[in-house]
Curated annotation (Swiss-Prot):
Species of provenance: Solanum lycopersicum (Tomato)
Protein's gene: CPT6
Compartment(s): Plastid, Chloroplast
Protein name per its UniProtKB record: (2Z,6Z)-farnesyl diphosphate synthase CPT6, chloroplastic
SUPFAM superfamilies, per the entry: Undecaprenyl diphosphate synthase
EC code(s) of this entry: 2.5.1.92
PANTHER family reported in the protein's UniProt record: (2Z,6Z)-FARNESYL DIPHOSPHATE SYNTHASE CPT6, CHLOROPLASTIC (PTHR10291:SF16), DEHYDRODOLICHYL DIPHOSPHATE SYNTHASE FAMILY MEMBER (PTHR10291)
GO biological process: plastid membrane organization; polyprenol biosynthetic process; response to cold
Reaction equations catalysed: 2 isopentenyl diphosphate + dimethylallyl diphosphate = (2Z,6Z)-farnesyl diphosphate + 2 diphosphate; isopentenyl diphosphate + dimethylallyl diphosphate = neryl diphosphate + diphosphate; neryl diphosphate + isopentenyl diphosphate = (2Z,6Z)-farnesyl diphosphate + diphosphate
Amino acid sequence: MNSLFVGRPIVKSSYNVYTLPSSICGGHFFKVSNSLSLYDDHRRTRIEIIRNSELIPKHVAIIMDGNRRWAKARGLPVQEGHKFLAPNLKNICNISSKLGIQVITAFAFSTENWNRSSEEVDFLMRLFEEFFEEFMRLGVRVSLIGGKSKLPTKLQQVIELTEEVTKSNEGLHLMMALNYGGQYDMLQATKNIASKVKDGLIKLEDIDYTLFEQELTTKCAKFPKPDLLIRTGGEQRISNFLLWQLAYSELYFTNTLFPDFGEEALMDAIFSFQRRHRRFGGHTY
């Protein structure tokens, strides 16, 4: 489209006809190369292709990185970048439900994030309260993974209420990782198992992969191991996230910062996953 029209409102009428502002075209109707209707068709086609594929990831984990850089690049306080948490995750959950993805795990706050400024941490804790209160009403099941006891008391109460209210919801399961670290998760699982051995509840020879996984915080999910990990923001590392569970996950890194991570970016990640051959340590033939 001509640059004259960039940033100008285009209003859709019936029959895929679009009208440009009267200051540009005198109120006449123009068919804008069907570009907008073609975009809608393309969007629907992508969703159908992905949804009809046998290679739908059951569990997608997301490291939501780049909020601070997004804000700083625009001369804004870092809090402005964090405000995209709820709307973007809501969009991701909505699209994932349509595609048939069953579990989303979002890395929202790590055990190391307490080292940030008290102003930023306090803002995030309030933001998480609002997040859980909002997601309580969305019809998805919501669970926390991570050390809840270190979180502010009010946030703990909101989380507990959200988990109780949504525990019977069918469909998508959203696991929020707050005060979470993969090393922490494995350590607390080890301590729990050691305590059970000490108390005579299990024997040493009973310890295996299955038993260990039952002590990880992700045990609340039907599919606790992610098929796909997405990291936004350009960094190519897993940053102490789901260390045990990611053993055979496909990794997808995108330069897109999380505030800009929308439907098209998520579709790109799913398409990338569907083009891969998962071998789980086996041979390629």
